[in-house]
């Protein structure tokens, strides 16, 4: 018979199995969000034909998800701090399902854009809620590791939106595939509401949260946001996260597949394998680099090393022609893996801010991750259209290697910017500055 966690004078901390299950169910919403984020990459031709659009408008349609996602990051963090991740995530999953249905049944570009916007705005809470929940269910010295696993789970959604979704689109059409994902999202909303709890104390266990984090009601949203935005390192980590993530989300999330199809002559499903490799590297890099940072007791050094490797990867991609399939696969995996270092930035940002503002700081940093990706996706489309030579196949524009090269230059510039931002941060040695200042 299992022992009562409340027996004795002091409740026990929650068992790892319960912590991972509770947190993992909520993290499933991040899986859904990531799937929806990169899904347009394998339906580029269908979307261009159905809505009669070129690259600029397609980039904008895909990027609307990122714009609304980014816009909701700070509100999501404030809500997670104020009312808890369970309520926020359940409501978000329901709204996401509605947005997916609207997108799948759209008969105009504007309706499709509204659907994509609803999806982005609703799943925006997922990552922030995961970080908020992790601070209550796991010890502080595992925060970067758990946050890294969030990235792994999310990227598995991206993997599902690669070859499997490509095959589903070819088999039943993009609209039916999207409707099926809406149904699964509704099921997830019910499961999160029934099982997830914001703090172990709701199940009779002791909490891992800092005492200040348990008194969120005493801190107004305005004060929380002011404290976070007044911290210098918050801004450096804001730019670092956005600039390192945007190239991967832009390439693997939208323009990588059409580039490989149009320039290298690959089949769409084969091209999706290459971009999926980048997402898999991203997925694996998050938890491994997060765990390395936790083990080293350092944040700046491993984050800087990952940022340098990421920038080098994009420079090689742009400068080295005629890479073999094997070399390109390894390069994409390395680019994705090194980008996973952005996970360290979330733990880093949490440590330089007040523990009662954990949700808010997560929202601020994550706003850059998605906001910068939105800007880059739209900018890539604009650059491609500016360099279009007039070729079309079955109603879809075809862009040559020079056009893509002009667009992809900005991926390398972005990665170099991330290196500079991380280099200017101050090390925390995996300790909360709030405690250090007491």
Please give the residue ranges for each predicted region.
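Cytoplasmic helix-loop-helix junction between adjacent transmembrane helices
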Residues: 115-153
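Helix-breaking motifs and short loop linkers at transmembrane-helix boundaries and internal kinks
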Residues: 52, 84, 105-111, 139, ...
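Juxtamembrane intracellular "pre-TM" segments in multi-pass secondary transporters
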Residues: 8-15, 199-238, 438
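Extracytoplasmic gate region of multi-pass secondary transporters
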Residues: 40-42, 231-286, 373-381
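Cytoplasmic membrane-interface "Motif A"-like loop-to-helix N-cap segments
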Residues: 82-93, 294-308
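Conserved MFS/SLC helix-loop-helix module at the cytosolic interface between two early adjacent transmembrane helices
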Residues: 71-110
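Helix-loop-helix hairpin linking two adjacent transmembrane segments in secondary transporters
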Residues: 150-201
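C-terminal ends and interior cores of transmembrane alpha-helices
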Residues: 94-107, 308-322
């Amino acid at each position: 018979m299992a022992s009562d966690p409340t027996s004795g004078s002091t409740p026990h901390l929650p068992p790892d199995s319960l912590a991972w299950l509770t947190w993992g169910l909520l993290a499933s919403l991040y899986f859904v969000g990531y799937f929806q984020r990169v899904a347009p990459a394998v339906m580029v031709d269908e979307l261009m034909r159905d809505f009669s659009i070129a690259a600029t408008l397609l980039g904008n349609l895909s990027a609307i998800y990122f714009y609304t996602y980014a816009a909701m990051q700070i509100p999501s963090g404030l809500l997670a701090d104020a009312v808890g991740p369970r309520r926020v995530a359940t409501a978000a999953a329901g709204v996401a399902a509605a947005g997916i249905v609207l997108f799948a049944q759209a008969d105009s570009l504007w309706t499709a854009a509204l659907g994509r916007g609803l999806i982005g705005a609703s799943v925006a809470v997922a990552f922030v809620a995961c970080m908020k929940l992790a601070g209550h269910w796991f010890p502080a010295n595992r925060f970067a590791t758990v946050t890294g696993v969030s990235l792994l789970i999310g990227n598995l959604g991206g993997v599902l939106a690669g070859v499997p979704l490509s095959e589903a689109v070819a088999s039943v059409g993009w609209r039916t595939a999207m409707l099926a994902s809406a149904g699964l999202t509704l099921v997830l909303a019910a499961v999160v509401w029934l099982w997830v709890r914001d703090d172990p104390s709701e199940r009779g266990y002791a909490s891992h949260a800092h005492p200040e984090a348990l008194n969120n009601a005493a801190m107004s949203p305005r004060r929380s946001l002011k404290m976070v935005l007044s911290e210098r390192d918050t801004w450096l980590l804001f730019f670092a996260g956005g600039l390192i993530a945007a190239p991967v989300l832009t390439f693997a999330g939208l323009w990588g597949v059409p580039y490989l199809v149009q320039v290298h002559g690959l089949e769409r499903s084969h091209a999706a394998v290459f971009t999926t490799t980048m997402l898999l590297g991203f997925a694996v890099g998050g938890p491994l680099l997060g765990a390395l940072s936790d083990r080293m007791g350092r944040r700046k050094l491993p984050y800087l090393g990952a940022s340098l490797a990421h920038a080098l990867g994009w420079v090689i991609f742009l400068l080295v022609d005629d890479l073999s399939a094997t070399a390109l696969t390894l390069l994409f995996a390395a680019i994705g893996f090194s980008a996973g270092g952005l996970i360290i930035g979330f733990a880093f940002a949490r440590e330089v801010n007040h523990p009662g503002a954990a949700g808010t700081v997560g929202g601020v940093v994550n706003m850059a991750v998605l906001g910068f990706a939105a800007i880059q996706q739209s900018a890539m489309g604009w650059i491609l259209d500016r360099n279009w030579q007039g070729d079309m196949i079955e109603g879809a524009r075809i862009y040559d290697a020079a056009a893509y090269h002009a667009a992809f230059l900005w991926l390398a510039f972005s990665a170099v910017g991330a290196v500079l931002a991380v280099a200017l941060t101050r090390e925390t040695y995996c300790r909360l500055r709030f405690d250090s200042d007491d």
